[in-house]
Swiss-Prot record:
Stated regulation of activity: Allosterically activated by HslU binding.
Subunit structure as annotated in this protein's UniProt entry: A double ring-shaped homohexamer of HslV is capped on each side by a ring-shaped HslU homohexamer. The assembly of the HslU/HslV complex is dependent on binding of ATP.
Organism: Borrelia recurrentis (strain A1)
EC code: 3.4.25.2
Family annotation (HAMAP family): HslV (MF_00248)
Protein name: ATP-dependent protease subunit HslV
PANTHER family recorded: ATP-DEPENDENT PROTEASE SUBUNIT HSLV (PTHR32194:SF0), METALLOPROTEASE TLDD (PTHR32194)
Amino acid sequence: MNFKGTTVIAIRRAGKTVVAADGQVTFGYTVLKSNAVKIRKLVNGKILAGFAGSTSDAITLFEKFEEKVKSREDGIIDIKRAAVDLAKDWRADKILHKLEAMMLVADSDNILLISGTGDVVEPEEDVISIGSGGNYAYSAALAYMENKKLSAADIAFKALKIAARVCIYTNSNIVLEEIG
């Protein structure tokens, strides 16, 4: 899937987890909005999530993911299990299968990418990015990770600023959430 119009990044470092995104919404070649919020806190602020793709589809997926997390009878928050369960449903369900979005979800211990093709990816490094500017932000973040003085929030902000300079579908109106 190749979504135009956003860049979302997730980073873990020094006990902090950050998900950040730009604010641009495009329709074709037109910028419709520059200050959209594409990330949110779920499960009473214990999980961060961000999306690239259709907004209405992403909201549906956020709700489904949160349902999966909360469905455990033992009350344990297990985003890996919830992500796999959501990916299975997303791939198999006739209605969900048509949703066009990708998600990043993160808690204090994990960062995951969930796609509609059934993929659940845990990055090798403590950083992952999606969307049209995702590769630019990811590359910049990997370079910034070498500077041990930078926090997860600093790295996310700087990486998105670089993506905004290169990707025409990404702007520098950055929204950032942090847990940990």
